[in-house]
Amino acid sequence: MKALTTGEILEKVSDSAIPKATSGFWKLFILAILAGAYIAFGAQASAMASFNLTSDPATFGLGKLVSASVFPVGLMMVVLCGAELFTGNNLMIIGVLDRKIKVSGMLRNWVIVYIGNFIGALLVAALVNYSGLLESGGGLLGAVTVKTAVSKTSLDFGKAFVLGVMCNWLVCLAVWMATGA
């Protein structure tokens, strides 16, 4: 099996927008909840693999490398399990530009998937909190998790937007490459 050309990937991504835009509410919503959970699992695994390293200035860079190496497992679960992730579904714009789906179908998908992703992530966050995992390392994992959350929610809008664009660019690139593989 050979890898797809750029044109073939473009066509496949465009065609994939059709079932995403026409999928039933409950199917889409459940797949979106699962995607949010998978990304949260990836984030939790990333934090657990790196919290000792990122909490020490001497090993902070290595900790970020470990974290960045583990986190994509969440996206792999999304792609391999066929779940619906808002960031990857931004590629649906290609289907709109090719006139294969309507803007309204794309926007419907985005709203349902965004809400479902949020619920899935909250569900995993609640499970992790209830499980006691945040007490790992004498509570250091919880402290690092809170510090990360505070730093992300304290960003001004401009920085948060630019970081979001950069993140989404990489997610879409990963989905694009997986489509071509």
Q: What annotation goes with each model-predicted range?
A:
Residues 1-181:
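Alpha-helical transmembrane segments and their helix-helix packing motifs
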